[in-house]
């Protein structure tokens, strides 16, 4: 089961253009390392278009069962799956270079489209949560008011809040938008940036 989940994630990476065929074994081995698995056998058959949310949940459930998560809660699951997705990501310099190539040689729109697609494909933008956001329009005497309840950033659970209070205070990264966030693993009181979509904004 876990072998199939790993193979599905690598296949997803290939389909999304995050992993080339030449890097398939390398990506598999990096995932095995994070999952602390030493034995692996390539499944005979996997879906052609694996579902990312389902695949990540399979990996997270397995990691939780084997004690790789401090707590099986949304905060720790998010930290861990961000680490996993970071294994499929190109280096920051590659993202920046390709963005600027598209910007200068094609168009600013092409560069922005590339970056937005990368943000979605890498799970930095969690599509399966955003679609659950609640939106409606409320009429007021000043005009229509657009109201949104953002469910793509769920509230921290009590255990994570307690852990954040007990966590040693750190001045690194200096802030949540500072350059030092690129590739940062995160902690209970600071978000992970392993799937580093802040590359171009930090670089410019």
Predicted regions, residues:
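Active-site microenvironments that recognize anionic phosphate/pyrophosphate groups
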Residues: 1-203
């Amino acid at each position: 089961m876990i072998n199939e989940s790993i193979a599905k994630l690598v296949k997803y990476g290939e389909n999304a253009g995050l992993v080339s065929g030449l890097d398939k074994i390398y990506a598999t081995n990096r995932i095995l390392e994070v999952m602390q698995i030493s034995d692996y056998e390539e499944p005979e058959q996997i879906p052609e278009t694996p579902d990312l949310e389902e695949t990540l949940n399979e990996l997270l459930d397995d990691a939780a069962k084997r004690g790789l998560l401090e707590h099986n809660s949304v905060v720790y699951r998010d930290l861990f799956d961000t680490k996993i997705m970071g294994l499929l990501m190109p280096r920051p310099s590659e993202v920046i270079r390709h963005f600027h190539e598209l910007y200068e040689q094609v168009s600013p729109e092409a560069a922005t489209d590339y970056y937005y697609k990368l943000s979605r494909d890498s799970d930095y933008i969690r599509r399966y949560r955003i679609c659950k956001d609640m939106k409606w329009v409320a009429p007021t005497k000043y005009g229509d008011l657009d109201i949104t309840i953002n469910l793509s950033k769920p509230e921290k659970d009590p255990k994570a809040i307690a852990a954040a209070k007990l966590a040693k205070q750190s001045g690194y990264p200096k802030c949540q938008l500072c350059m030092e966030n690129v590739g940062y693993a995160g902690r209970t009181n600071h978000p992970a940036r392993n799937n580093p979509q802040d590359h171009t904004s930090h670089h410019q």
